């Protein structure tokens, strides 16, 4: 994903504009039946990115770039050692952006490598409930994040979950099975998982 640490603001906006145009062309072609494999299939491509939440809670892309996207997954990738209060404020501020719909790998843990950061889960769950924010079940084998005991708490509170593979290569899409298994251990049902819903319902949730 483009970031201000690697690209100038204009370069980022141009990259996302080109991506948006390409996705619009794909969706038009699907609608017109130009793709044989997509015929008779309700299929729609959304324009999204995973965006870093900076230590102050701001997002690591310029606002003009964010406005071109359909929705965001926001995540922590740096400075994991903040106090519980500061980390909680950081995440809640990141989630306040209207395009931010999903918190990615919410605990920040890496199995057998790194403990998760300190976070006030009661405040996060309450914020997600009030603002219709979702939590990711990251299926990458060294993450499995949200863990099952926190999935149970999210499900109790009717907070929607998104099972994502965090794929960086096509073959890693198979990791979805680990996310499904983790969600099941957390007693999640089909209705708790956004990406078990139909295209129309997913669009309604993510694009509003």
Residues covered by each model-derived region:
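Charged catalytic cores and adjacent phosphate/nucleic-acid-binding surfaces used
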Residues: 1-44, 55-208
């Amino acid at each position: 994903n483009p970031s201000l640490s690697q690209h100038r603001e204009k370069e980022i906006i141009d990259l996302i504009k080109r991506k948006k145009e390409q996705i619009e062309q794909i969706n038009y072609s699907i609608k017109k039946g130009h793709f044989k494999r997509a015929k008779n299939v309700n299929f729609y491509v959304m324009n999204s990115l995973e965006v870093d939440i900076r230590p102050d809670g701001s997002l690591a892309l310029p606002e003009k770039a964010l406005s071109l996207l359909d929705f965001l997954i926001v995540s922590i990738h740096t400075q994991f050692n903040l106090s519980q209060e500061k980390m909680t404020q950081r995440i809640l501020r990141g989630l306040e952006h209207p395009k931010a719909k999903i918190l990615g790998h919410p605990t920040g843990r890496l199995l057998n490598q790194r403990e998760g950061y300190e976070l006030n889960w009661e405040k996060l769950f309450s914020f997600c409930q009030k603002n219709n924010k979702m939590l990711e079940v990251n299926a990458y084998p060294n993450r499995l994040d949200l863990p099952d005991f926190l999935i149970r708490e999210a499900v109790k509170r009717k907070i929607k979950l998104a099972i994502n593979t965090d794929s960086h290569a096509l073959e890693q899409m198979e990791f979805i099975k680990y996310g499904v298994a983790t969600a099941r251990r957390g007693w999640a049902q089909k209705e708790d998982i956004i990406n078990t819903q139909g295209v129309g319902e997913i669009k309604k949730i993510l694009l509003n």
